[in-house]
Amino acid sequence: MNIIDNFEQENISKLTANKKIPDFEAGDTVKVTVKIIDKAIEKDGKEKLTERFQAYEGVVIAKRNRGITSSFLVRKISHGEGVERRFMTYSPIVHSIDVVKYGVVRRAKLYYLRHRNGKAARIRERHITSAKPKAVKS
């Protein structure tokens, strides 16, 4: 590994020290909690910064793995309009990522979902079962 790769790995380990990033791929439905900082002006003229969290839930239509600059694109339907938002995977603004549903798709990039709506835009769900050891009959 060269110097740049070592630097990226160190920064990734620092950024993920207090949060867990799950394994997800295109077709999965994720819920991304984003930190939003609002600036409000009080009555006496002072600025006050308030911090809140906002959830964004949608289908991952693309994932880009490029070290510290990795990102993923999430699409959701809001008030009948398609909305896409790109999140940097290791950004400090991203508070948490939760996988809601696992989808079954045969493509890495699902840009074709932009032109589909309603039932045509559905993705089959992959059911994950935990492997339980079978009881031994004696």
Swiss-Prot record:
Gene3D superfamilies assigned to the protein according to its UniProt record, in alphabetical order: 2.30.30.790
Q: Name one GO cellular component term.
A: cytosolic large ribosomal subunit
Q: Tell me, what is an example of a GO biological process annotation in this record?
A: translation
What are the TM regions of this chain, as residue ranges? Answer: none
Gene Ontology molecular functions: structural constituent of ribosome
What does the UniProt keyword field contain?
Ribonucleoprotein, Ribosomal protein
Q: NCBIfam families from the entry?
A: rplS_bact
Which function does this protein serve? This protein is located at the 30S-50S ribosomal subunit interface and may play a role in the structure and function of the aminoacyl-tRNA binding site.
Q: What family is it from?
A: Belongs to the bacterial ribosomal protein bL19 family.
**Mind telling me what this protein is named?**
Large ribosomal subunit protein bL19
Q: Which organism is it from?
A: Rickettsia typhi (strain ATCC VR-144 / Wilmington)
